[in-house]
Regions:
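Solvent-exposed, polar/charged alpha-helical surfaces in well-ordered, non-transmembrane soluble domains
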Residues: 8, 12, 16-19, 85-92, ...
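Active-site cleft segment of glycoside hydrolase catalytic domains centered on the general acid/base Glu
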Residues: 77-87, 148-150, 155
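Extracytoplasmic low-complexity repetitive segments enriched in small/polar residues
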Residues: 47, 62-63, 75-76, 94, ...
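Loop/turn elements at helix/coil->beta-strand transitions in domains of secreted/extracellular proteins
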Residues: 21-25, 60-65, 95-101, 128-132
Length: 180
């Protein structure tokens, strides 16, 4: 799994949940402030595409890819087409036949941008076989959910569980039959 600070904060819970569901090896790589395709070596930030390139070159390749990026890209790009290009660039690094789950984005301070990004994500993944979108946005947008800390981005303890469940649910749709 490749993600940002949300993923980093949920790493233990995601790993435990996926392990309990039968995966023998779960690797979660989350980093604060990570963006899809923009890194900053001076600050030690590695872009998601760089991590994906490294993972794609490793052997064995992952049975299932999970991407949870976009939070730090929300509000930066001009329109849905720009977000679609960004997402397609990330996907170009991943094997086209590999199962892939992408967890969509929610930021209280960038709701409209998240909606645009998430529509682009849905559109791009609808064209890719063996893909699923985990709907984190919907989880967070429910008024009664109370899953986020006061910053409106990062999950609180209850939100960490909900985020991990969102990941596991998206992966369950894709899990290779031989692993079930």
């Amino acid at each position: 799994m490749i993600g940002d600070s949300i993923t980093a904060g949920a790493q233990r819970t995601v790993t435990a949940l996926l392990s309990r569901s039968g995966f023998s090896s779960v690797i979660v790589n989350g980093q604060n402030s990570r963006r899809i395709d923009v890194g900053n070596r001076k600050r030690g930030l590695v872009a998601g595409t760089e991590v994906a390139s490294y993972v794609a070159a490793s052997h064995p390749s992952p049975l299932v890819w999970v991407i949870a990026l976009g939070t730090n890209d929300a509000g930066i790009y001009r329109d849905g087409a720009a977000y679609a290009d960004l997402i397609e660039h990330m996907l170009s690094v991943v094997q086209s036949t590999a199962p892939l789950a992408w967890i969509n984005t929610y930021r209280r301070d960038q709701l409209r941008s998240c909606e645009i990004l998430n529509v682009a994500l849905n559109d791009v993944l609808a064209k890719r076989r063996n893909s699923a979108v985990g709907n984190w946005f919907e989880q967070c947008a429910l008024p009664e959910s109370r899953l986020l800390s006061s910053d409106g981005v990062h999950p609180n303890p209850r939100g960490v569980l909900a985020f991990a469940d969102t990941v596991a649910s998206a992966v369950a749709v894709l899990r290779p039959r031989r692993e079930r």
